[in-house]
Amino acid sequence: MHLSQLLACALLLTLLSLRPSEAKPGAPPKVPRTPPAEELAEPQAAGGGQKKGDKAPGGGGANLKGDRSRLLRDLRVDTKSRAAWARLLQEHPNARKYKGANKKGLSKGCFGLKLDRIGSMSGLGC
């Protein structure tokens, strides 16, 4: 296992082991939330009998828009953090490129990589 993967796993475990009440002692504990897709579906199902022009009693239409925008913002943050974790844990796409022969001081043959190519073309190699 690579060192970066090991560190990422350790960091993830420490973050998961913290509970919201431990992280912020002054904040009240959060209640379990339903998935955002279900939260978006519930207001639509509850207000299904109303038309677009109708307003909810008590000015609830503005609050509904605020709830939807908050939910969409939460979804965006979640996907950004997932993408960041995926990039962190993913192997570098050109990992072969950075291994072995491209390091200075390492040579594949008796005269070094460049001279070996010249020697193989001219027949002067070892």
From Swiss-Prot:
Biased composition annotated in UniProt, kind: Gly residues: 46-63
Q: Where is this region: Disordered?
A: 20-71
Which GO terms of the molecular function aspect are on file?
Answer: hormone activity; hormone receptor binding; signaling receptor binding
Positions with biased composition (Pro residues): 26-35
Which gene codes for it?
NPPC
One Gene Ontology cellular component annotation held by this UniProt entry? protein-containing complex
Quick one: signal sequence residues?
1-23
For whether the record's keyword set contains Signal, the answer is yes
Which PROSITE patterns does the record match to this protein? NATRIURETIC_PEPTIDE
Q: Which GO terms describe its biological process?
A: angiogenesis; blood vessel diameter maintenance; blood vessel remodeling; c-di-GMP signaling; cellular response to glycoprotein; cGMP biosynthetic process; cGMP-mediated signaling; chromosome organization
Keywords, alphabetical = Cleavage on pair of basic residues, Disulfide bond, Hormone, Osteogenesis, Pharmaceutical, Secreted, Signal, Vasoactive
Write down the InterPro entries for this protein, in alphabetical order.
C_natriurtcpep, Natr_peptide, Natr_peptide_CS
Q: What is this protein called?
A: C-type natriuretic peptide
Q: What species is this protein from?
A: Homo sapiens (Human)
* Keyword Cell membrane among UniProt keywords: no
